[in-house]
UniProtKB/Swiss-Prot annotation:
Keyword Transmembrane helix part of the UniProt annotation: yes
Pfam family, one: FecCD
Keywords: Cell membrane, Ion transport, Iron, Iron transport, Membrane, Transmembrane, Transmembrane helix, Transport
CDD domains: TM_ABC_iron-siderophores_like
Name of the protein described by the UniProt record: Iron(3+)-hydroxamate import system permease protein FhuG
Gene that encodes it: fhuG
């Protein structure tokens, strides 16, 4: 009994150690390689100006953003799977990411003029624009999937359709951009945190931290929802009210991550599933473990994306998709 109680803590401790290892590897690797000893010297204020620039202005913001986005997307996926009672639910598959991406591209196209020169104000407005698009996508999916209730398979099929529609609109507005912005938007939509900076971190940090804490606070309702709507209602839970609140939290988390990293598919599917297998379905432990696993997977994928074809770079979203697509197919076959 004691081992079962301690298992989530053990999983989080091991995952944290893995994050620390990849953190330092990611700091050292890149087009400009910095030896571990020199990295420590920089942190103690004894490094060269070049090493300080590379670490503090390029690599460290990117690593921190990877950890935040990985945690946010993974917890959003865990919420969606529980709220919809559908183990295949995930922000990318359901079209929520595509809605947020479309809103961000529209914001840049109409108000900022260039994807490469966002103002300080524009950077902080990105999560709000992504949230508007993600909420619109979620609303459309919920309305179109409703037919005397929402079945899991209908939710997935409608989500795929909405996803395709938003992606078509994305392409239309991309084609109206100049060639440089078109390429940047295409890479970003594929999932990329190239060009991560401290402004972007400060823009999404409050959203992700507050919503993670809020989700932990609401974990007991996610546990009850797993029992089914009738039993949950019998236990005195306002099921529809709590479902809408938690759905909004998941959409907002996903939108914040879209604003920072574009469309990241499958991470919100993989991390909660791995966490559930390791620690069980209790959301008081499932949520933090999902966040840890998601952060680790995203940071690992981004480190690979930066270095496998260096000096060229692969969008991190493509790396995650290569890993996640087979797992999604496996779950589909398992669910029959």
């Amino acid at each position: 009994m004691k081992t079962k109680t301690n298992k989530p803590l053990i999983v989080m401790a091991v995952t944290f150690l893995l994050i620390v290892v990849v953190f330092f590897i990611s700091l050292n690797l890149g087009v400009i390689k910095i030896a571990p000893l020199k990295t420590l010297q920089v942190f103690f204020g004894q490094g060269t100006a070049r090493d300080e620039l590379v670490l503090f202005e390029f690599r460290l913001p990117r690593i921190i953003l990877s950890l935040l986005v990985g945690a946010g997307i993974s917890v959003a996926g865990a919420i969606l799977q529980s709220v919809s009672q559908n183990e295949l639910a995930e922000p990318g598959i359901l079209g929520i990411n595509a809605g947020g991406s479309l809103a961000v591209v529209l914001f840049i196209y109409f108000f900022q003029g260039s994807a490469s020169d966002l103002s300080f104000f524009g950077t902080f407005m990105l999560p709000f624009s992504a949230l508007a698009g993600a909420i619109l996508a979620a609303f459309l999916i919920y309305i179109l999937a409703w037919k005397k209730g929402v079945t899991p398979i209908r939710l997935i099929l409608v989500g795929i359709g909405v996803n395709a529609g938003f992606n078509a609109l994305l392409l239309i507005f991309q084609l109206k951009m100049d060639p440089h912005d078109f390429m940047q938007a295409a890479v970003w939509i594929s999932g990329s945190i190239w060009g991560a900076n401290w402004n972007m971190i400060w823009a999404i940090l409050p959203w992700i931290v507050i919503l993670l804490l809020f989700t932990l606070y609401k974990a007991r309702y996610l546990n009850i929802m797993q029992l089914g709507d009738q039993l949950a209602t019998g236990l005195g839970t306002a099921v529809e009210k709590e479902r809408r609140i938690l759905l909004l939290a998941a959409v907002t988390l996903a939108a914040s991550c879209v604003a920072a990293a574009g469309g990241i598919a499958f991470l919100g599917l993989i991390a909660p599933h791995v966490a559930r297998r390791l620690t069980g379905p209790r959301h008081q432990t499932l949520i933090p473990v999902s966040a840890f696993i998601g952060s680790f997977l995203f940071l690992l994928a981004d480190t690979l994306a930066r270095n496998v074809l260096a000096p060229s770079e692969i969008p991190v979203g493509l790396v995650i998709s290569v890993l996640g697509a087979p797992y999604f197919i496996y779950l589909l076959m398992k669910a029959n």
